[in-house]
Regions:
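Catalytic cores of carbohydrate-active enzymes
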Residues: 20, 78-87, 95-102, 106-175
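Residues at the C-termini of beta-strands that transition into short coil/loop
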Residues: 24, 88-91
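Asp-box/WD-like beta-propeller blade repeats and closely related beta-sheet repeat scaffolds
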Residues: 63, 91-94
Length: 175
C-alpha cells in the first residue's frame, strides 16, 4: 500500500490535476510528470487491489484521485471530446502524441473499473456516466482503430502527414 500512497501523493504534489506521474527517482525527483496511460492504469490498479482486499476504505481513499484523473484525461487530454485522449502513451515513439490504441484501451478499462468503484461507493450518477462512456469508447475502438485492409488494429489515429512526419523523424534519428 505504501507504493500506491507514494504514487498518489507525488502525483498530486507534482501535477495537482489527477495526472499520475510516469517516472520518479528513489530520491523523489520526478523525471516525467506523466504520459497519458498512467492515469487510467491507476484507476484499474485501485480496482484490482480492492478485488483482492475488499477494503472499502481503500477505495474511498483513492476515489477522489481517480475522479480527478478521469476528468483530466477526458477533458484536458481529449480536446475534440471523442473519448480518445491525445498524447504520449505506452508506445513511446518520438513525435507520436496523437490518439493511440493503447491509451484508448486503458481508458476504456479505467472507465469500466471506475464505474465499479463508484457503484461500491454508491455514487450512482458517476457510475452511470462512466459506464455509458465505456460502452461508447469500446464501440469506437473497435470501429475507428480497426483496419479492414490489414485485418488488424492501428496503433494510432492520425493523418497521412502525421505518419510521414514520424517516418521522417525516425530516419533522422537513425543517422
Amino acid at each position: 500500500y505504501s507504493s500506491i500512497r507514494l504514487l498518489d501523493s507525488l502525483s498530486e504534489a507534482t501535477n495537482g490535476n489527477g495526472r499520475i506521474v510516469h517516472e520518479v527517482s528513489t530520491n523523489g525527483a520526478v523525471f516525467n510528470p506523466g504520459n497519458i496511460n498512467e492515469t487510467p492504469q491507476f484507476a484499474s490498479l485501485i480496482w484490482e487491489v480492492y478485488r483482492w482486499n475488499g477494503d472499502q476504505k481503500f477505495l474511498e481513499t483513492y476515489y477522489p484521485s481517480i475522479k480527478k484523473g478521469m476528468h483530466w484525461l477526458l477533458t484536458e487530454k481529449d480536446t475534440d471530446q471523442n473519448l480518445f485522449p491525445d498524447g504520449y502513451g505506452m508506445m513511446e515513439i518520438h513525435g507520436l502524441d496523437s490518439e493511440m490504441i493503447d491509451v484508448a484501451s486503458y481508458t476504456q478499462r479505467a472507465l469500466v473499473d471506475a464505474a465499479k468503484i463508484a457503484e461500491v461507493l454508491k455514487d450512482t450518477a458517476t457510475a452511470e456516466n462512466y459506464k455509458a462512456k465505456a460502452a461508447v469508447l469500446k464501440e469506437q475502438i473497435n470501429t475507428q482503430f480497426w483496419s479492414e485492409a490489414f485485418n488488424s488494429y492501428a496503433d494510432f489515429i492520425g493523418t497521412d502527414a502525421q505518419a510521414l512526419h514520424l517516418i521522417e523523424d525516425a530516419i533522422v534519428r537513425a543517422d
